[in-house]
Amino acid sequence: QVDRKMGDVPEDCFCEPAPNVVVPAIQQLSYSYDSQDLRDLYVNLLASSMDKRVSYLVHPSFVSIIGQLTPDEAKMMSFLSKEPGKDHVPVIDLRVVEDDDMPIKARWRLLCENYTNVFDAIVQCPENVSLYLNNLERLKLLSGETYCYEGEDDYLGIEDSERIRNIKKD
């Protein structure tokens, strides 16, 4: 696969890859036989490490970052990188305000955190997407900004999703 990827690289741009990148990447690649998405990430990293036009951008920590991804998270990152203009993902937290006599409703209970259905069609375990988002944020691959987004249409599909309807019923 690396040979295919390197096919577009001019011969004069080939360089010796850094051993602290290539050795662990090949080791990790051998553990990823069941996930094409993870294999693709390792292959791209290996190919980039052998192309002197971009090899300076390859950091040894990238191997361990890929190693901390699930196949679904790799799919999500691939989806986001290929979607034109996809600089945000609508995410909601569903809370219920506790009923009490206070004039200001200060107590609430979290029913669902970090939920989105944007990735449901591409991941194997849609019920884990909020965990995946937390991990991608922990790895600094995504930034979880908390603010009110004005594009309400982006949220309609989420609010009308089966999971949110079921939570609201309970």
Task: Annotate each PLM feature.
Residues Q1-L69:
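Charged, alpha-helical interface segments at or near domain boundaries
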Residues M6, P19, V23-I26, V89-V91, ...:
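Intrinsically disordered, low-complexity regions
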Residues V9, S49, R53, E73, ...:
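Amphipathic alpha-helical interaction segments
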Residues P17-N20, L111-G151:
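Short amphipathic alpha-helical interaction segments
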Residues D34-R39, T70, D101, I122, ...:
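Short, structured coil/loop segments at alpha-helix boundaries
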Residues L57-A121:
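Short amphipathic alpha-helical interface segments
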Residues G151-D170:
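Short, amphipathic alpha-helical interaction segments positioned at domain boundaries
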